[in-house]
Amino acid sequence: MFEVNDVVQFNENHRWCPALGIIDEVKKIKDDTRYMVAVPIPDKGTAYIYALESDNSIEKIGKAVIVYGEE
């Protein structure tokens, strides 16, 4: 199980090129857990990707120390 601010590699089961992101939200749904992964896009902003724990499409890399928007 992942936590908010975990740094993850998101590969969507090899449908997309792997990307690094930060877990922004964790939500329990029925028998699964949904993660909202914030993926920074240079000069564009942030893309938000949803992934289910059952998909096995993300793996933990580490923990974010500095997170913008928090005080």
Where are these regions (language model features)?
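Short beta-strand-centered aromatic/proline hotspots
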Residues: C17-K28
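Intrinsically disordered, low-complexity, charged/polar segments
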Residues: A38-E71
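Short aromatic-glycine-enriched beta-strand elements
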Residues: D31-A38
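Well-ordered beta-strand positions in beta-sheet-rich domains
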Residues: V7, L20-I22, T46-Y50
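Intrinsically disordered, low-complexity regulatory regions enriched in Ser/Pro/Gly/Thr
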Residues: M1, R15, I29-D31
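Short coil-to-beta transition motif at edge beta-strands of beta-rich domains
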Residues: M1-E12
